[in-house]
Design a protein with these regions (language model features):
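Short, structured interface segments
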Residues: 1-2, 61-97
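Aromatic- and glycine-rich peptidoglycan recognition patches
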Residues: 3, 8, 13-22, 26, ...
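Loop/turn positions that initiate beta-strands
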Residues: 13, 40, 173-176
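Short, structured beta-strand/loop micro-motifs enriched in basic residues and often containing a Trp
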Residues: 17-28, 154-164
Length: 214
């Protein structure tokens, strides 16, 4: 018997699978988009619906942890009602280095196809056609069943650093390598290497192309 998410079935710590695409926000009262979750993704309820008794207002947000990338955000509860199915357990799938490498060609093909679609840069975008930089990279790998962290600085910490000679950079980089930009304190941008030093990325209006470009 399928159990759908409602106020009656709301239990902290319970696990659910999405039946819709949904936006994830920075906090319970912020409209800043930080991620998006697509149909089929799983999440855990980690905080209850909040009520603002002073203003007699119910805050329509629930705090969740997305299981595939361990990312925490807030969903609009009204969008979740009857749109998430209860699951009893969830396990991550482990990939060997060889298995990941074997999927790089299809990951690159997916990214190039995303570039051909009409798109623009969207902070917090991970579903498409509009992405932010790390959302594009995460979604590219997820298209082949490989989940990596959500944000660029998290992806940098997750990956293995490679020492490169700047003069032969294009020769040493391999297709599928991630390129990180920013300061020594924190990475602020990421791109996906294609070949010969060229990389594909989604960049904003101020410092980029307002969308996906090579």
């Amino acid at each position: 018997l399928e159990v759908l998410l409602t106020k009656a079935s709301f239990v902290l710590g319970s696990l659910w699978k999405l039946r819709i695409n949904i936006d994830g926000f920075k906090s319970e009262n912020s409209d800043e988009l930080v991620t998006q979750a697509s149909i089929g993704r799983s999440f855990q309820l980690i905080d209850c619906l909040r009520s603002n008794f002073k203003d007699k207002e119910i805050i329509d947000r629930v705090k969740v942890r997305l299981l595939e990338d361990d990312y925490i955000c807030w969903f609009r509860f009204s969008e979740l009602i009857h749109q998430a199915s209860k699951i009893e357990s969830w396990e991550s799938e482990l990939f060997t280095e060889e298995r990941i490498i074997s999927r790089i060609p299809e990951i690159l093909s997916w990214t190039k196809a995303a570039k051909k679609m009409s798109n623009e840069y969207l902070w917090g975008g991970t579903i498409g056609p509009n992405f932010d930089c790390s959302g594009l990279v995460q979604s590219a790998f997820a298209s082949s069943g490989i989940w990596i962290p959500r944000d660029a600085y998290q992806q940098e910490k997750f990956c293995k650093n490679i020492a490169l000679d700047i003069e032969s950079l294009g020769e040493e980089l391999k297709p599928g390598d991630l390129l990180f930009f920013g300061s020594s304190e924190k990475c602020t941008h990421v791109g996906l290497h294609i070949e010969n030093g060229f990389y594909i990325h989604s960049s904003g209006v101020t410092d980029g192309h307002n969308g996906i470009e090579i």
